[in-house]
């Protein structure tokens, strides 16, 4: 079984935003495995599948995945106040929870699966549960509580190439999209390494550029780019992209976006 340093796993799982902070948590005796065993050394090698917890941490959302949207919200200045949100790939509802806690008036929790949404959200009148729904076939009339102002996307085993086209007529004009770009599901099979992990910076760049070109070709503007503060389940670096649903075609890419700088920073944090 593949193993990795404990401090690196702490960062990958979003418990710390730097290796130095991860080391401090470990040395302070605050990091534990799922078997309630304390991790004592930053350099200790643990199976990459080990789920770690930070003692004393209070996660304010129904899942740690919510921290991905918090990063997007803060990096891209997304304002959820009184907005209608479409959460594509809602799973347990981390993104929906973040949106509602930050002022959203309602959220469509849409997922192809079933019985995943946390009960707190399932029983919330502001949440429209749309389970067993393949977004590829969604239409504007499916969203009976009103047209979404903001969409969030966190999907697996499917490319954004198949999600962005049907979203365009569903989302309000000038609506924002916070999309998680997952190289392991966007790159060709020959570009994905062992255990489904993409480590090559060039592949990361190719995936980001492809997603940007797809977006502007559909009429979205690419307005922002950063990396996710939490890696994918197998340790994959993922990226957050902000799109704007403009009326012009093709869209434009913000000249301030520096793809290489974002990739370099992500690799310095997670590898």
PLM segments and residue spans:
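S4-like RNA-binding module at protein N-termini
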Residues: 4, 20-78
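Glycine-rich helix-loop-beta junction characteristic of Rossmann-like nucleotide cofactor-binding loops
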Residues: 15, 74-81, 144-145
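Conserved class I S-adenosyl-L-methionine
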Residues: 80-91
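Conserved SAM-binding loop of SAM-dependent methyltransferases across substrates and taxa
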Residues: 92-104
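S-adenosyl-L-methionine
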Residues: 108-162
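A short glycine-rich, Lys/Arg-flanked "PGG" loop and its adjoining helix->strand segment in the class I
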Residues: 161-178
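Short, glycine-/aromatic-enriched active-site segment of Class I SAM-dependent methyltransferases
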Residues: 183-199
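Flexible, glycine-/basic-rich loop-and-beta segments that form/coincide
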Residues: 237-271
